[in-house]
Amino acid sequence: MRTPEWKLEFYEEKGRAPVLDFLRGLDQIKEQALAAALSNVLAYEGIGVCRSSWGKWVQGAPGIFEFRVRHDAATVLRERGLPVPKELREGSGEILLRVFCHAHGKKVVLLLAGYDKGKEPSMKRQSAEIKRAKQRLTRWKAAQERPAKQARPIGGVHKRRGKRRP
């Protein structure tokens, strides 16, 4: 079995991971579907999902793409040529889940926001989730820059040792 090419990271804020909370709040069939799709599709394809029915780039939100889950976990696994565990529950209802993501670094996907589009199909809800994903990405980028700024020496001199950097 091959190793996933992409690492999935949950955006964290105030000690919580909103997409993980979303995942855990779903009913069992949808939770299994999203977990199977994240680990067997997104972790292998990363931004490549945007070249398929699994994803698309979000207009007006640079760097953010939408990961789309439309099948139950058993279907996801079968489509990937993987065995389906007997304990996996197959769903007969509609599955229409969305997770908004950002790719960065060396093949890392940051999971920013998610919602059940089947439950709330309105454009208003979709727009609100995209806005939330954009805000989280902005905060995440700012947090990534802070440590880098703190680590840079001022005027080429390390404050700790008082020596010039090479």
Listing of model-derived features with the role each one plays in the protein:
Residues 1-95, 116-166:
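Basic, Lys/Arg-enriched alpha-helical interface segments
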Residues 103-113:
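Active-site beta-strand-loop-beta-strand hairpin of nuclease catalytic cores
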Residues 97-103:
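Short, surface-exposed beta-strand/loop micro-motifs that present aromatic residues
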